Each structure stands twice: as C-alpha cells, then as structure tokens.
C-alpha cells in the first residue's frame, strides 16, 4: 500500500493529537511537524521521533536550544501530499498561499474563516461533499459537537428548528494566561453566536439560533439544544439512533452517579484513555426529553480532541481514498472511538 504523506503545520493542542492519530493509520505516513517556537512541545515531538521543521529564520534558534531540525516549513510542504494546518486561527489563511504555490492540498481548522476552503467539513454530515476537494475546513470543536447531534437526528426525521446554548470552557488546561477565572462571560452578548452561522456552512438551510457563554473551567464545553422535528419523535427512537451512531456516547447519569464534565473526564482517565481524550460527543441520557415533535438534550464536548477523527477523515475525503463509511470505520477502529455508552 502506498501511504499518503501527511505534514502537520502547527504542533499545539490539535496538531499534536492529529500527529499521533496519523501514526496509527495504515494508509498514512507522518513526514513531519512544524513549530515556530522551541518550547516543551517541540522537545516532546523530538522525543517521540517526529521530524521537526520550522521557519528558515528560526532554524538556528531551535538548534541552539538543542532541538534537531529537519529543515524549513517549505521543505516539509514540498515533501508532503497533504498538509494538516493546525496553526492559530487566522494564520492558516496566510499559509494557504504557500500550499497553493507548491500545489498541495490542505486541511484547515475551525479557527479559520469558512472562505479559506472549498468546503466546511463534518464527517457524519457531509463527507461526500469534500471528496477530491483541495482545501477543506474542519469546523470548530463546538460546531462539530452540534453537527454530530443534528445530522444524526436529521437523518431520522427532518429538523425544522434548533435553538441552543453553548457554555464554553474558558481555556484549555495548558493555557495559563487565559480566563476568566471568576466570572461567567456572555460570548457574545448579542444573538446569535457565530456557532449558528458555522453550522449553516455544513447543514445548509436549517433554522438555527445559538447563544454562547464562557465559564471558568478548562475541561469541556457543555451544550443544551432544543430541537423541533417535522414529525413526532419518541425518547426511545432517539436513544436507539444515538446509541447506534459512531462518535456519539450516552452517559446514564443515574446509573453512573455522574452528571458533570469533571466526571466525564475522570471516567476517561479511569478507562486509561490516551491523554484522557474523549473525541466522542457525550450526551447525558437523562437530559433527553421529548414532547411530540420537540426534543431537548444536553451533552459535553471535549474541545481538545473532538476534531481529531474529523481531520483524519478529511484527508481521505480530499484524496478520495475511501468511502465515507469505510473511512469513519477505520478511523474509529484505529483511534478506539466508540458508540453506545461511555460506561
């Protein structure tokens, strides 16, 4: 099998996780990762045996820090078939010009504007729309969580309306300079939040309005959705379709005696998950409520890992390597992503 040569531009929260995921794919080869600062993440990448690349002007800086550099970012791009751009939001648009110059395909993250790519992507929703596309944007962690739930329900019964509230984590665990630490912030106070617009880049034409808050936590986001479907949907119907959908897990809070994002993460630790990651959308089963054609539910989104499998599937879609179902199945198997119940 000829393996796809994948480069990672940006080795932070998302980039390092995607790098590890690529190493587990039988049809992919990680040729290197790029960093612009010689910090602890660069040292850990070197310890893992990843080839490190940086900007031409920073090569000496890395070497002076004791970090071996394989070459410039341009060298890495030239040697790749496709690039995962996991640079900070807005930076990817600048790198796109370089990718185009070398005739390389690229996968961008949700921090970029949607017009950076040919298509915004969520594997369960619109994999086929991304086949053979040169530039794909994996939507943000929050939008990925929303879309997994909405597309699953929409495939069962057409959704007429969605209203939702996103309680965002204030920072990732490693981000010591972000907050708030003693406030809940309207983010933004105006309605709708950008999440509704982002959903519409994938699930087009749906009536959706969202609001968003930032809470002083680092663990996960928490969403509440109120959904109106065309026809009556029972709780039993929802439990059946959600429990049989990959990348969605249910948590029975009464049975597990767990009803918080902290306990979800603790379960991940106790199960020995790598980095304690939870790339699945975790729905509180007890929160699922139906009344005729109305649905209410709550779920947690692990912002550090939920988009990782989406990036892997986006690579296969862009290069037309596998069908939707084949790619999702292989990604889930290699990354040990489940369906059914968290515990």
From Swiss-Prot:
Keywords associated with the record: Cytoplasm, Glycolysis, NAD, NADP, Oxidoreductase
GO BP of this protein: glycolytic process; lysine biosynthetic process via diaminopimelate
Subunit structure, interactors included: Homotetramer.
Pathway connected to this protein: Carbohydrate degradation; glycolysis; pyruvate from D-glyceraldehyde 3-phosphate: step 1/5
Residues engaged in binding D-glyceraldehyde 3-phosphate: 140-142, 195-196
Gene3D superfamilies, per database record: Dihydrodipicolinate Reductase, domain 2, NAD(P)-binding Rossmann-like Domain
Protein name stated in the entry: Glyceraldehyde-3-phosphate dehydrogenase
Keyword Magnesium carried by entry: no
Molecular-function annotations in GO: 4-hydroxy-tetrahydrodipicolinate reductase; glyceraldehyde-3-phosphate dehydrogenase (NAD+) (phosphorylating) activity; glyceraldehyde-3-phosphate dehydrogenase (NADP+) (phosphorylating) activity; NAD binding; NADP binding
Gene: gap
Active site (UniProt): 141
GO CC terms: cytoplasm
Organism: Sulfolobus acidocaldarius (strain ATCC 33909 / DSM 639 / JCM 8929 / NBRC 15157 / NCIMB 11770)
Residue sites binding NAD(+) per the record: 13-14, 111, 169, 303
Pfam families for this protein: DapB_N (PF01113), Gp_dh_C (PF02800)
């Amino acid at each position: 099998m000829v393996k796809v040569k994948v480069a990672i531009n940006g080795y932070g929260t998302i980039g390092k996780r995607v790098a590890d995921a690529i190493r587990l794919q039988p049809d992919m080869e990680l040729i290197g990762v790029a960093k612009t600062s010689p910090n602890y993440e660069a040292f850990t990448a070197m310890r893992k045996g990843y080839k490190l690349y940086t900007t031409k002007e920073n090569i000496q800086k890395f070497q002076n820090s004791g970090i071996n550099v394989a070459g410039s970012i341009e060298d890495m791009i030239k040697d790749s078939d496709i690039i995962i751009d996991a640079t900070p939001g807005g930076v990817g648009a600048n790198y796109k010009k370089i990718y185009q110059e070398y005739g390389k395909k690229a996968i961008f993250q949700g921090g970029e504007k949607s017009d950076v790519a040919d298509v915004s992507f969520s594997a369960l929703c619109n994999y086929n729309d991304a086949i053979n596309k040169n530039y794909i944007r994996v939507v943000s962690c929050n939008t990925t969580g929303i879309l997994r739930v909405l597309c699953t329900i929409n495939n069962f019964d057409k959704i007429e309306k969605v209203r939702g509230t996103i309680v965002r984590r204030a920072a990732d665990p490693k981000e010591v300079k972000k907050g708030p630490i003693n406030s809940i912030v309207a983010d933004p106070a105006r309605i709708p939040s950008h999440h509704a617009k982002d959903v519409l880049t994938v699930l087009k034409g749906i009536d959706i309005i969202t609001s968003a808050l930032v809470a002083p936590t680092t663990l996960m986001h928490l969403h509440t959705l109120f959904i109106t479907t065309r026809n009556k949907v029972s709780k039993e119907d929802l439990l059946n379709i959600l429990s049989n959908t990959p990348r969605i897990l249910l948590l029975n809070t009464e049975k597990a005696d767990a009803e918080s994002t902290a306990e979800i993460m603790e379960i991940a630790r106790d199960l020995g998950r790598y980095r304690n990651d939870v790339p699945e959308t975790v729905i509180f089963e007890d929160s699922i409520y139906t009344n005729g054609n109305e649905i209410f539910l709550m779920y947690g989104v692990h912002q550090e890992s939920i988009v990782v499998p989406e990036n892997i599937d986006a690579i296969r879609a862009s290069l037309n390597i596998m069908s939707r179902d084949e790619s999702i199945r292989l990604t889930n198997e290699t990354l040990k992503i489940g369906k059914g119940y968290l515990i």
